[in-house]
C-alpha cells in the first residue's frame, strides 16, 4: 500500500458481549497502523468504547439500527404496520448517523467503510453518503443461527450484500448462504480470536465437568441438547457435572433443570451466568459441548482449542469446517451420538486431539496473521482489482 488507508468500522453493540463484537476487536488489534488508520462508529457509550480508546482508536457515537425482526406468527397486516413504523425510525437514525459522521469526521478522508456484522445496513448507506468503498463482514446466517428476518426481505438484503466492493465471510457455509456464485471480491477466512502472546501451557489436570458456553442459553444454541445428552450419559453418577455459562431466562432454566430432575441429576448442573473471563473454565473442563444447531463459526470452539479443551461439535453450520472428526475433535449428528461421545471421552487419553486442535487454532485464528489478510482485502478494493485468498 502506498498510503495509509483510513477505515471507518461500524459496530452494532456498545458493549462487547457477542462474538461479532469480540471478533471485530481482534480485527482492529491486528491492523498495522502504518498502513491502516481505524476509526470506529458505535451505537452508544460503553465498556467497548473504552477498550478501543485504550488502543488509540478514535470513536464516535451515532445510531446503528439493526433492521431485523424475530420470527412471529402475527397476521400479515400487523407485521406490515410494524415494519413501516420500524422503517421510519430507521430512516431517521440513518439521517442522524450521516450528520454525526459528517461533523465528527470532517477532517478525515475516509477510504473504506467496514461493516463489522451482517446485521446492519448502516455501513452500506454511509459508504454511499461518503462516496467511498464498502467492505461487508458476514459473520452470521441471521435466519439459521439467530432466527432473524430482515424487514427488507432476504432477496433484497442479498442483493445489497453482493453489491459491496468486497465481502468477508467467516466460513464457507456463511459465504454459500449469502454470496452469489459470480460475485467478485468475495473473500472467505476465519475470524481472529486470540493473540499468540496469550498462549499458555495446557492444564493437564482436568476437572469432572462438561462445559456449555454461549452468550444466551436457548434451544437454537443447543442448550437443550447438552442437557439431554448429559442426562442420557449417566455420567453424573460418576460425579461429572454440566456447567452452563451464558445469560439464561428463568423459565428456560427451569425447563432444563426439570430434565435433570427427571433422572436425578439436578445437583450436577450449574448455571453460572454470563462470564467474560472464560479461559479458566475451558482450561479445566473435561470437554466443551458445541451444540448450536447452526453456528456460523463459533469463537467458543476456538477458545476450547486454544485452552486445551477437547470439543464435541454438532455436525451443522460452520462447525464441521473447524473440527476434523477424530483428529481435532469429534462431530455428532444426534443427542444419542453426543451422549456416547461424552461417555467415551472421559475414558480416553485426549493428548493428541488437544495438540492437533491447538496447532490448528494457532495456524488459523491469531491476530498476528489476520491483519495481513485484511490488508489484502483493502488493497484489492482500493486498486479496484479482484482477488481471492
What are these regions (language model features)?
Residues 7-8, 203-221, 227-230, 243:
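Conserved donor-binding/catalytic core segment of Leloir-type glycosyltransferases
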Residues 18-26, 217-232, 254, 302:
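A conserved mid-protein helix/loop that constitutes part of the nucleotide-sugar donor-binding site
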Residues 41-47, 213-214, 241-255:
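Glycosyltransferase donor-sugar binding loop
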Residues 60-63, 158, 162-198:
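Donor nucleotide-sugar binding/catalytic pocket of nucleotide-sugar-dependent glycosyltransferases
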Residues 255-273:
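Nucleotide-activated donor-binding/catalytic signature segment of Leloir-type glycosyltransferases, i.e.
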Residues 274, 293:
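Aromatic "clamp/platform" in nucleotide-sugar-dependent glycosyltransferases that forms part
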Residues 310-313:
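Short hydrophobic beta-strand element within catalytic cores of glycosyltransferases
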Residues 325-326, 330-336, 344-350:
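Conserved acidic donor-binding segment of nucleotide-sugar-dependent glycosyltransferases
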Amino acid at each position: 500500500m502506498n498510503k495509509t488507508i483510513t477505515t471507518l468500522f461500524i459496530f452494532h453493540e456498545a458493549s462487547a458481549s457477542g462474538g461479532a463484537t469480540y471478533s471485530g476487536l481482534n480485527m482492529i488489534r491486528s491492523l498495522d497502523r502504518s498502513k491502516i488508520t481505524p476509526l470506529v462508529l458505535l451505537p452508544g457509550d460503553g465498556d467497548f468504547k473504552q477498550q478501543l480508546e485504550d488502543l488509540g482508536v478514535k470513536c464516535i457515537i451515532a445510531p446503528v439500527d439493526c433492521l431485523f425482526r424475530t420470527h412471529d406468527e402475527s397476521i400479515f397486516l400487523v407485521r406490515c404496520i410494524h415494519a413501516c413504523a420500524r422503517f421510519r425510525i430507521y430512516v431517521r437514525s440513518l439521517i442522524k448517523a450521516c450528520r454525526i459522521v459528517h461533523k465528527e469526521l470532517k477532517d478525515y478522508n475516509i477510504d473504506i467503510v467496514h461493516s463489522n456484522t451482517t446485521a446492519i445496513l448502516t455501513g452500506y448507506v454511509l459508504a454511499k453518503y461518503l462516496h467511498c468503498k464498502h467492505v461487508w463482514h458476514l459473520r452470521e446466517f441471521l435466519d439459521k443461527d439467530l432466527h432473524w428476518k430482515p424487514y427488507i426481505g432476504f432477496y433484497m438484503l442479498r442483493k445489497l450484500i453482493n453489491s459491496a466492493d468486497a465481502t468477508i465471510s467467516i466460513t464457507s457455509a456463511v459465504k454459500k448462504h449469502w454470496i452469489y456464485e459470480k460475485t467478485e471480491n468475495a473473500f472467505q477466512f476465519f475470524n481472529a480470536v486470540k493473540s499468540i502472546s496469550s498462549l499458555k501451557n495446557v492444564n493437564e489436570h482436568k476437572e469432572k465437568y462438561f462445559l456449555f458456553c454461549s452468550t444466551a442459553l436457548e434451544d437454537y444454541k443447543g442448550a437443550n441438547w447438552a442437557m439431554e445428552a448429559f442426562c442420557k450419559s449417566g455420567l453424573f453418577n460418576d460425579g461429572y457435572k454440566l456447567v452452563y455459562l451464558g445469560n439464561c431466562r428463568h423459565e428456560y432454566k427451569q425447563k432444563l433443570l426439570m430434565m435433570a430432575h427427571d433422572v436425578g441429576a439436578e445437583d450436577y448442573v450449574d448455571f453460572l451466568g454470563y462470564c467474560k473471563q472464560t479461559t479458566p473454565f475451558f482450561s479445566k473442563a473435561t470437554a466443551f459441548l458445541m451444540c448450536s444447531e447452526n453456528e456460523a463459526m463459533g469463537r467458543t470452539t476456538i477458545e476450547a482449542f486454544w485452552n486445551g479443551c477437547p470439543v464435541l461439535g454438532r455436525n451443522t453450520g460452520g462447525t464441521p469446517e473447524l473440527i476434523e472428526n477424530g483428529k481435532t475433535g469429534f462431530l455428532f449428528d444426534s443427542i444419542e451420538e453426543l451422549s456416547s461421545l461424552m461417555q467415551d471421552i472421559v475414558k480416553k487419553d485426549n493428548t493428541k486431539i488437544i495438540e492437533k486442535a491447538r496447532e490448528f487454532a494457532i495456524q488459523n485464528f491469531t491476530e498476528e496473521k489476520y491483519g495481513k489478510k485484511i490488508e489484502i482485502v483493502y488493497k484489492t478494493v482500493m486498486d479496484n482489482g479482484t482477488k481471492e485468498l
